[in-house]
Amino acid sequence: MKKLLTTMTMLLALGQSAMAQFGSCTPSERYEYKDKQTGVTIIGLTDTTKNDRFMYQTDPMWTADGKYLLFRSSSRGDGKEQETVGRDGKKRKYRPTNYFFIDLETYKIIQATDGKEGGVFLGNKSNKFYYNRREEGKWNLYEMDLDSFFADVKTGKCKKQKHYERFIGTFPTEMGRPGGMAINSDDTYAFISVERDGTDEEKERMSKNAFIPESNQPIKIKPVLSGLRKMNLQTGEVTKIADVEFKVGHIQSSRFNPDEIVFCNETGGDAAQRMWYAKADGSVVKPLYKETPLDWVTHETFASRDYVYFNILGFQPRLRKQASGILRINLRNDDVELLGQVEMKADGDQLRGRGFWHCNASRDDKWSAGDTFAGSVWLINNETGMRYHIAAETKMKPDHSHPAFGPDCNTLIFQSGHFTNGKRLNLMMVDLDKVVK
């Protein structure tokens, strides 16, 4: 009988895990290990049986009060496999992505969506969670009250998701087709990138000015007429910021100034001019860091009040004829600084000499971090130039490491396929106070 009860208990636990849903709270998966190559102690936040990812490194991942850390996963929750049809008419199967929070006091994992959400973004001033849904062909934006939600989760009396959310507005179809979004620093507007139809004259100019890559570079993303819009988070009103004649990608908002936007010309590779800066009223739309033909600029991050950090790639022989690595540009005077590149002999054996791929920085501008083509994560002291090898063999599969800093400027996070040989990603955290003494 005792054996039977034990078996039933295990089956019940497995069933509850499989049917995890909105508001469910599961035990901590936290563990620690020491990287064999770097000697750094790394905290694992999720176990190796799931495939979890942080948000893209340009977006905030900590709640405004710093108590919860956001991530996404298609292997958690109870989302069943679904089928969709792409623009090319081809069918594909997928599991819905759900969004989760890690309670940084207990490391318990809380499911915060039910798989119907598209893009998401955390509030900067208050514990709000913004997300859009496609409902009856409409793009609708919602705001979720996280304080109320977390309080109910702790008591075990979580209500349905609609209880915590407020409908903000519907995006008008005549304003374009919404893509990415970012919430500004005072939580008053959502900045939204769009694709649009435009005029024949615009299309002709766009085709004429389209970037022509080197012969060994594929064209991954074709240019498309795009623009920037903003939605008032109180009224839902949508207004135009600007139109551009290239595909807008990686839209970002300053976490300090409510009217500053950074975005990119997204080609899936190199561009004649990748980085762009705009004011929310549309009065300024200009290139940010004017590129030379040998500059392959990528993965810009609006990390601090006055600086945008970015990479100039050096992964091809032709690109190594000038400086490459992590740089930053001062938004107030356009001054540019090269912060560092990894030593070629220390960049692993697999892709030696290819250097940094993605970058980020702490809000106080003291630290920058980058991942490399070889799968290492590095930390740079921007004041001294000192470099610290944090992690090796992240595999950069099934996604890149994408390092990012916490709001305390002493915490570094990244994702890694180290323990699964690149089959699944686990979420990692490093306490920088223990690395730099």
Report each predicted region and the residues it spans:
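Blade/loop signatures of beta-propeller domains
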Residues: 21-43, 222-226
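Short, conserved, GDST-rich strand-edge loop motifs in beta-rich repeat architectures
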Residues: 22-25, 74-94, 142-146, 192-223, ...
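Multi-bladed beta-propeller domains
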Residues: 33-53, 100-117, 147-176, 231-247, ...
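Blade-loop segments of beta-propeller domains
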Residues: 51, 56-59, 76-134
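Conserved beta-propeller blade repeats
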Residues: 52-70, 114-134, 167-190, 195, ...
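Asp-box/WD-like beta-propeller blade repeats and closely related beta-sheet repeat scaffolds
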Residues: 114-226, 240-243
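Loop/turn-rich, solvent-exposed surfaces of beta-rich toroidal or solenoidal domains
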Residues: 307-327, 335-386
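Blade-level signature of beta-propeller repeat domains, shared across WD40, Kelch, NHL, RCC1
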Residues: 400-437
